[in-house]
Each structure stands twice: as structure tokens, then as C-alpha cells.
């Protein structure tokens, strides 16, 4: 799943899509997920600032929304969630000379807001599961 924050993807739309597959008895596997930080212009690669807080937050929000649509909104339907790499220093997206910074860690292996968004979502979900009394 290769997406960009400038695409009009919402958690609700993704949740409905995943539910539709589940309603047909299918499992959903989100695989090869990467979310480009930089936008493309007319199909060409562009350069952007990998430290731009607005871009980083949009990327983090989309990572979080995809995971939430998968595991929180469709428990039992979504059975896999995998990224296409770990850090921005080694990504297939940079093969054409552009830079896209699509992963959870930057080029220095520092956590990006996307990592924190996924971690916080999973942690809050785990805490709810552990604290349930039923």
C-alpha cells in the first residue's frame, strides 16, 4: 500500500473498505505500507524539507488512520500490518533520484512522528484490552 498524505483517504473510507472485504469473508493484510512525505508534481518527483512539521504530522496522521481503520474499526478482519522498510535511508522510493522520506524512522534512525502515532495508538488499545473487566 503506497499512499501520500495529499490523497483524500479518510479513516472512515478505509474502515468501510476493509469492512466490505470482511463482509465477504476475506482477511485484510496491509502490506508494503509507506507514505510519501513529499508530493509529486505532474508525476515527477519533488524535493521537500524532511523536517517540515506540517508534512510530518500529515504523514503520522495517515499512518495512524490506516492502522486504526484496520485493527480498531475492523478487529478480526485485518490480520497483518507491515511497512515497506524501516528507515528513510533505505527505501525503494528514492531509486528515481527524488527523496520521499516514507518510513517510520529518519535517515539517522531517529523516530519520526509516524512512529510515535502508531506506538501511541497500539499502546492505548493494549491498555484498554488489559483494563477491561469482562
Go through each PLM region and give its residues:
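Aromatic-rich peripheral "rim/lid" segments of glycoside hydrolase catalytic domains that contact
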Residues: 9-29, 33-134
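Surface-exposed cleft-lining segments at the edges of enzyme active sites
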Residues: 1-8
